[in-house]
């Protein structure tokens, strides 16, 4: 019995872009073959949407007046409403219209992933995946004071535990908050 190893908790990714990496990534996106790459990356951070949710988002589901969007194709299969920041609204307003009504004209997930990997590599960023943009966005919103409930709704997470995996508040931020008391 002593030879049997107990299962361990899986190691979860907690990769968040630094400010410098964000600038480098945005600059690299500007040179992408995919015209809307920067808009996709920025909206992923701003909205906390998963890749599939974002690439399937339609103009008709974005109410730029109220600042809300309906994400129909979610991981859970249940549509959810999200808030749109001022920056997200600005990005959506400036997107060229597509024939199929989607925000982005992306041919396939595999071609998109190749383009995204290319801009990350050209930006000099190591060990970074598209899904890590959710970590970056959740962390930024948490540092701005968003509650767990707000983050759960925006990101489509079903538990506070999941939010804690994505919102990676560092010791530097905690020290800054304590100094302001």
Stretches found by the model and what they are:
Residues 11, 32-35, 105-111, 127-132:
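N-terminal core-binding DNA-recognition domain of tyrosine site-specific recombinases/integrases
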Residues 16, 73-77, 87-89, 109, ...:
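Catalytic-site neighborhood detector that most strongly recognizes the C-terminal catalytic loop/helix
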Residues 18, 25, 116, 163-166:
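Mobile genetic element proteins and their domesticated derivatives, centered on retroelements
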Residues 39-42, 46-53, 118-123, 134-158, ...:
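C-terminal catalytic core of tyrosine-transesterase DNA break-rejoin enzymes
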Residues 85-126:
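Active-site/catalytic core of tyrosine-dependent DNA strand-transfer enzymes
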């Amino acid at each position: 019995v002593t030879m049997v190893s107990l299962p361990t908790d899986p190691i979860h990714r907690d990769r968040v872009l630094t400010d410098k990496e964000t600038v480098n990534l945005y600059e690299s996106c500007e040179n992408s073959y995919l015209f809307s790459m920067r808009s996709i990356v920025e909206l992923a951070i701003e909205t906390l949407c998963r890749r599939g949710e974002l690439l399937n988002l339609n103009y008709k589901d974005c109410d730029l007046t109220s600042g809300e969007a309906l994400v129909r194709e979610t991981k859970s299969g249940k549509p959810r409403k999200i808030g749109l920041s001022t920056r997200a609204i600005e990005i959506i307003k400036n997107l060229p219209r597509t024939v199929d009504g989607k925000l982005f004209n992306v041919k396939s997930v595999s071609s998109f992933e190749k383009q995204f990997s290319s801009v990350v590599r050209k930006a000099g960023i190591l060990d970074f995946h598209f899904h890590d943009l959710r970590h970056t966005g959740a962390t930024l919103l948490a540092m701005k004071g968003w509650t767990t409930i707000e983050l759960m709704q925006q990101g489509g997470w079903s538990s506070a535990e999941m939010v804690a995996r994505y919102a990676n508040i560092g010791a530097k931020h905690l020290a800054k908050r304590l100094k302001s008391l």
